[in-house]
């Protein structure tokens, strides 16, 4: 079976869907990035970009960190750097760790179910 050429509207629809998918999973990704301990904002961005396809800008990450802080999932503090500007470090609260565990479980169940449904597509089935 050959693939039909994609139209501009189809490509746009897929792009919008991908944006929504990223937005929906970014909170979990940030919580997971903080699992190992304190990181400042740019370190979080680098962690998300390393070995993944999660390209996130500063205009996205800082409002998200503020929301996670308002929800009591992360804490932050300014730390003077030996050279350069002070950096704001973020880390998970106990509630943040619990939320990350629970979200990870939901994600594993959801992605497992979806991968099972996608099996025939990945195998190139015609039906």
Regions found by a protein language model. Give the residues of each.
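Short polar/acidic secondary-structure junctions
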Residues: 53, 79-81
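Short, hydrophobic-biased segments on the C-terminal half of alpha helices
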Residues: 62-69
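Short beta-strand "wing" residues that participate in macromolecule-binding interfaces
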Residues: 76
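Glycine-centered, phosphate/nucleic-acid-interacting loop/turn motifs that mediate DNA/RNA or nucleotide
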Residues: 72
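Amphipathic alpha-helical dimerization/coiled-coil segments
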Residues: 3, 98-127
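Basic, amphipathic "hinge/linker" alpha-helix immediately C-terminal to the N-terminal HTH DNA-binding motif
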Residues: 82-104
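N-terminal helix-turn-helix DNA-binding core of bacterial DNA-binding proteins
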Residues: 18-62
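Intrinsically disordered, low-complexity serine/threonine- and proline-rich regulatory segments
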Residues: 1-25, 103
